[in-house]
Amino acid sequence: MCLLMEINNNANNTNTTIDNHKAKMSLVLSTDAKPRLKWTCDLHHKFIEAVNQLGGPNKATPKGLMKVMEIPGLTLYHLKSHLQKYRLGKSMKFDDNKLEVSSASENQEVESKNDSRDLRGCSVTEENSNPAKEGLQITEALQMQMEVQKKLHEQIEVQRHLQVKIEAQGKYLQSVLMKAQQTLAGYSSSNLGMDFARTELSRLASMVNRGCPSTSFSELTQVEEEEEGFLWYKKPENRGISQLRCSVESSLTSSETSETKLDTDNNLNKSIELPLMEINSEVMKGKKRSINDVVCVEQPLMKRAFGVDDDEHLKLSLNTYKKDMEACTNIGLGFN
């Protein structure tokens, strides 16, 4: 019971002290024509405690503050205006804090950006040095490739020129062979010499078609000489001329032997048979004249024989063909 009495006494004492404090707290008004309330430090501290009890400036209301504070003479108008100012101050502080935080974050971002820029600058310098080396290597490789391509193009052009020249040479030889065959086809006589020439021309044409234009002309000249000798001997006039040549040669040899014999006889019998020597000399003069006459007769016969026959045209065509073939070989050597 004693304890209960003490607790009640303490409570009464606290209430009395609070009432005394409220009574002591008097409002301070300004001396203007329209007096205004001055918020002292104690009054403002009391206001802050009441706001915190109500849950902060956003939840506190002027009526709630009036009930909590319980100060006589304090009106809703005074609490409302002071609460608005308090809220503005809090918001300004909050904005200032935000600005400080944002400025700090911005400073950090700027510093991070600067650091990243520095790192990028170092990496860029390294990358710039590496691409420079790579660029030099690429340019050298491109130059080498261009040189190789130029050499290949030059070789291709040379091969084209050689191919064109070889084709032109083959066409020329084919045209020459066609002309020779046409000239041979114009002759109506079908003797062995013509057949032989045709076979040789066909053989040369086949060689040209097979790609052997630069054949040796020794065979061709040998064939032509054999053909000319065969054709010349085949003529009846030429046969007579050959017989005359043989007879003249035999007579000349016999006359020479007789002359040598007579010279020896004359040397032995000079002093004895002078008239016989004169007779023999006259006889020998007559024999020489007859031999010269025979030789003189032989030459126009040969000229007439070579100038009349149609086979002479064949010889001329073969000679021209041989010259054309020699010219073709010279052209081929010039190409090579």
From Swiss-Prot:
This is Myb family transcription factor PHL8. Residues 31-91 form the HTH myb-type domain. One of its GO terms (molecular function) is DNA binding. The keyword Coiled coil applies. Residues 62-87 bind DNA. InterPro entries: Homeodomain-like_sf, Myb_CC_LHEQLE, Myb_dom_plants, PHR1-like, SANT/Myb. It is found in: Nucleus. Keywords: Coiled coil, DNA-binding, Homeobox, Nucleus, Transcription, Transcription regulation. One of its GO terms (cellular component) is nucleus. One of its GO terms (biological process) is regulation of DNA-templated transcription. A motif (LHEQLE) lies at residues 152-157. Residues 139-159 form a coiled coil.
